[in-house]
Amino acid sequence: MARRLELSEMKRRIPHQARARDTVETIFEAVARILRREGLDALNTNHIAETAGVSVGTLYGYFPNKQAILVAMARRELEKTEASIRAAITRSASGSEASRAAIRALIRGFGGQNSLRRDLLEAMVVNGHYAELARPAENFARLMLKAAPGQFANLSIGLTEPQAFVLTRALVGVIRAAVFENSNLMGTDALEDELVRLAQSYVRSVASRLKSIGGQNGRDLGRAPV
């Protein structure tokens, strides 16, 4: 198993100033260009620096190696996915629509047939950050309950930690498998339908169980609610 990169290894200099942020953005753009044109095997720090038009020393001032750059780029993509999920749910008129819109945003966040995003997300796994891939799905689960309080009334306190773990890893596991297997299901209504059914059926099952045992709270069934 690959060694997990520690935070101090991921980024050496925090780009607070505009010029520093521009440099980091230039590095990111260079990496994206190389991945699209030449593939992951062609990626190394010398090639990145040359493509970005910066010195290798400047690059190392921000990132210790190419894996750190890939992880930083992947985290930015995950943040965009989370924002897309929040926006999708906010725009939806009903809980059912919210679930579908959020699932669609989650699928798009994992890149579908976008090889660049696949490379970035795989870097998270290789470097020991798999749990972070589930963060957008965790936010989806929380927001879905808020968007449909009547539909999931018994879960007003939220899912317990084990319940949230099972649901989010099920969603992420299916999407990740479809992405890395280059499945023809990616981007189809059929896959979207099944993921929506998975999420809603699981949450309804949990809500029904709570009702059948007299509305016990999440702390009786598991750890703290999510």
For every predicted segment, state its role.
Residues D22-I34, K80, A105:
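Pre-recognition alpha-helix immediately N-terminal to the DNA-recognition helix
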Residues R118, E122, G150-L198, V206-G214:
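Hydrophobic/aromatic-rich alpha-helical bundle segments in the mid-to-C-terminal region
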Residues V56-T58, Y62, Q67, A74, ...:
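Membrane-embedded alpha-helical bundles of multi-pass transporters/translocases
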Residues T26, A30, I34-A68, A72:
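Helix-turn-helix
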Residues M1-D22, S92, L155, A207-V226:
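N-terminal intrinsically disordered/low-complexity leader segments
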Residues K11, M73-S99, R118:
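Amphipathic alpha-helical linker/stalk segments
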Residues A87-A88, L120-G128:
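Short linear capping/connector segments at secondary-structure termini
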Residues E79-I85, E97-R104, R108, G112-S115, ...:
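Amphipathic alpha-helical packing segments from all-alpha helical-bundle domains
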